[in-house]
Amino acid sequence: MTIAIGSTYQEKRTWFDDADDWLRQDRFVFVGWSGLLLFPCAYFALGGWFTGTTFVTSWYTHGLATSYLEGCNFLTAAVSTPANSMAHSLLFLWGPEAQGDFTRWCQLGGLWTFVALHGSFGLIGFMLRQFEIARSVNLRPYNAIAFSAPIAVFVSVFLIYPLGQSGWFFAPSFGVAAIFRFILFFQGFHNWTLNPFHMMGVAGVLGAALLCAIHGATVENTLFEDGDGANTFRAFNPTQAEETYSMVTANRFWSQIFGVAFSNKRWLHFFMLLVPVTGLWMSAIGVVGLALNLRAYDFVSQEIRAAEDPEFETFYTKNILLNEGIRAWMAAQDQPHERLVFPEEVLPRGNAL
């Protein structure tokens, strides 16, 4: 048997190894494998949105002016959804609708599908970026897991909901006032505010804001700095690197306030992670239900009684009336291509039915 002394086995490097080294090397802005998805998609999504809000009209899809060029401002400009007749077409520039004509593609609403799809994959790339960097510095992946919540909301609202409806037309347009209109649409056609999944989402977001405020205030309240001086205001020095707040003092404070308090930082911060993420995921699940036109909390008995007894009215029946008004006014305004004409007898009256 022959033994080679002084030689070591070295695996042959491939192009993949070279690419891996370049993508993951330490630089000011980390690229990584996730960057191959994140950076192009984010660039195209933002570029498409800025292009649409600056130059592109929605006259051919919604009968609206939605660009700076037409006189809109930041709050009223938008990249609008495609025409209802486009259904669920991906509206590729080279597809049968636009046939390579960029102007026609913009007129049909192609920029909306462009922004929505690149935006979705850009968000997913950002989550993968958090996984990748956490892996490289030996951290747990909770940041990426938390970021799955806003991704779930984006995908459910902008993609899954219109997929359950007749077309992309019923998704939100990408603009501030456009999102407000979509919220009113959700209320009028789905009674969204009374949906338990929406309630859980509100509880999660507002509860997280409350937890964030309480946590920040408590840490500031219990800051200390080593020393014998009576004046502890120096503890607010923002450049001090060490952890300088007292968990014991915070625990005692909230035990006196509420009677209960978090006993360790791990459970406290996990709870601060759990509340908003769970809330956003629940709201995303609720929107998936709306995509299928599922309804929740229709108190029909109150509606029937309100119809029979003009003196009986609840906040629920008043809201049902408001929803009817939203539908009656919005449907004709929002879907002019349907040429809807509502006779007087179907417009909202003075009771729930």
UniProtKB/Swiss-Prot annotation:
Taxonomic placement: Eukaryota, Viridiplantae, Chlorophyta, core chlorophytes, Chlorophyceae
GO BP: photosynthetic electron transport in photosystem II
Positions of chlorophyll a PD2 binding: H198
Presence of the UniProt keyword Transmembrane in the record: yes
Catalytic activity annotation: 2 a plastoquinone + 4 hnu + 2 H2O = 2 a plastoquinol + O2
Residues that coordinate or bind Fe cation: H215, H269
Residues recorded as bearing N-acetylthreonine in the entry: T2
One Pfam family this sequence matches: Photo_RC
Transmembrane segments: 41-61, 125-141, 153-166, 208-228, 279-295
Molecular function per GO: chlorophyll binding; electron transporter, transferring electrons within the cyclic electron transport pathway of photosynthesis activity; iron ion binding; oxygen evolving activity
SUPFAM superfamilies: Bacterial photosystem II reaction centre, L and M subunits
Function summary: Photosystem II (PSII) is a light-driven water:plastoquinone oxidoreductase that uses light energy to abstract electrons from H(2)O, generating O(2) and a proton gradient subsequently used for ATP formation. It consists of a core antenna complex that captures photons, and an electron transfer chain that converts photonic excitation into a charge separation. The D1/D2 (PsbA/PsbD) reaction center heterodimer binds P680, the primary electron donor of PSII as well as several subsequent electron acceptors. D2 is needed for assembly of a stable PSII complex.
Family of the protein in this entry: Belongs to the reaction center PufL/M/PsbA/D family.
Membrane topology per record: Multi-pass membrane protein
Official protein name in the record: Photosystem II D2 protein
Binding site for chlorophyll a ChlzD2: H118
Additional facts recorded: 2 of the reaction center chlorophylls (ChlD1 and ChlD2) are entirely coordinated by water.
The entry's keywords: Acetylation, Chlorophyll, Chloroplast, Chromophore, Electron transport, Iron, Magnesium, Membrane, Metal-binding, Oxidoreductase, Phosphoprotein, Photosynthesis, Photosystem II, Plastid, Thylakoid, Transmembrane, Transmembrane helix, Transport
Residues where Phosphothreonine is found: T2
